[in-house]
Amino acid sequence: MNGQNIRIRLKAFDHRILDTSTREIVNTAKRTGAQVRGPIPLPTRIEKFTVNRSPHVDKKSREQFEMRTHKRLLDIVDPTPQTVDALMKLDLAAGVDVEIKL
């Protein structure tokens, strides 16, 4: 697989789970002899929701909730076939969305 790069994008709501999953991928790739660029932290997406506290009156009384989506980017340069096999067998934590581009 000479001349190819594997780009991995990870997304999660909890940054601790995201960082441990990223570390697992980096350690697996380095163990199999591939060069890793990253992890590169991408901007966190913050969605805010504003709702009324009471069901029908008191428009001035509101509550805000937010949902944060943390993202990381990894590039694996010139992966070996062993690297690809190891990454396919890797079991990551639940709650981590993985996108892989070749």
From Swiss-Prot:
InterPro entries in the cross-refs: Ribosomal_uS10, Ribosomal_uS10_CS, Ribosomal_uS10_dom, Ribosomal_uS10_dom_sf
SUPFAM superfamilies: Ribosomal protein S10 (SSF54999)
GO molecular function, one term: tRNA binding
Ribosomal protein keyword on record: yes
Keywords, in A-Z order: Ribonucleoprotein, Ribosomal protein
Cellular compartments per GO CC: ribonucleoprotein complex; ribosome
GO biological process: translation
Stored Pfam families: Ribosomal_S10
PANTHER family documented for this protein: 30S RIBOSOMAL PROTEIN S10 FAMILY MEMBER
Similarity annotation: Belongs to the universal ribosomal protein uS10 family.
Known role: Involved in the binding of tRNA to the ribosomes.
Quaternary organization: Part of the 30S ribosomal subunit.
Protein name per its UniProtKB record: Small ribosomal subunit protein uS10
Gene that encodes it: rpsJ
